[in-house]
Amino acid sequence: MATMTEEREAQRTARRMRLDKALGDVVRTLRSMGAIRVMVFGSYVEGPLRRWSDLDILAVMPSTRSGAQWFRDVHAAIDTDVPVDIVTFTEQELSARRATSSFVRRALRTGRVVYEQGQEG
């Protein structure tokens, strides 16, 4: 009979596997849309993971559209079985937000780059 601690650990392991799969799917979708850089931040990187943990992603997209336009397009294209919060910026928007947004500064400081254009393979 599993203890409560063992059950929680099994739940966290199962959640990590679902989040890992979803992250791979999201990165593939963002790459196909032309992403310049993709970062994951929040509990996925910093812990602790809980059974309700989601993915927090910051995507730097080409300047062919605004971050707001990319946001709509990206969210329409993403389909995962776990909650995913994605914020999208162009390089210029990200530079401007870095100066004014503690949320953006924290995501950049604590996040982990999982894709960068030109750094594949």
Place the predicted regions along the sequence by residue:
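Catalytic core of pol beta-like nucleotidyltransferases
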Residues: 1-37, 45-51, 62-121
